[in-house]
Amino acid sequence: MLCADFLNTLYKLKINRTFIEHIKNSSIKKSNKCTYINMEVEKKIDPLGFREYDARWLYPKSINSKGIEAVGKGFGTQVISSEKNPIVIVGNDYRSYSEEVKNNFIKGLLSTGCNVKDIGLCLSPTVYFSQF
């Protein structure tokens, strides 16, 4: 959420008017100190990230957090349609953004009714073999 006073600063700095109008047209919430404007982040997913046997993107350049959540929701929808009460195992690597990506993916999975087991920091083969 952005404070409406911040919008005035943007106007003074002659920031992109289209961006400002988009912000102004978002839903508005009042508080004691100032007016807040809710800015929803649009999901971004580069379709070229989907490969034959996996998916790979540069985060956040090719996919953002809402996009990751949507991929989790799509995956969860596929899993839940073929199995009753599925358990999906997830893990993450050492990269600085991996935890954020994993959490958004889990959010998408949970929204479909999948059960999730998070095994934390691990190698890819660990996730694969953890299903047995």
Task: Go through each PLM region and give its residues.
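A glycine-rich helix N-cap at a beta->alpha junction
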Residues: S111-G120
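Serine residues within intrinsically disordered or low-complexity segments
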Residues: S26-S27, S31
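Short hydrophobic targeting helices and cationic amphipathic motifs
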Residues: F6-L7
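An N-terminal, well-structured beta->alpha segment
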Residues: N38-F105, S111-T112
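Conserved phosphate-binding catalytic cores of ATP/NTP-utilizing and phosphoryl-transfer enzymes
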Residues: L121-F132
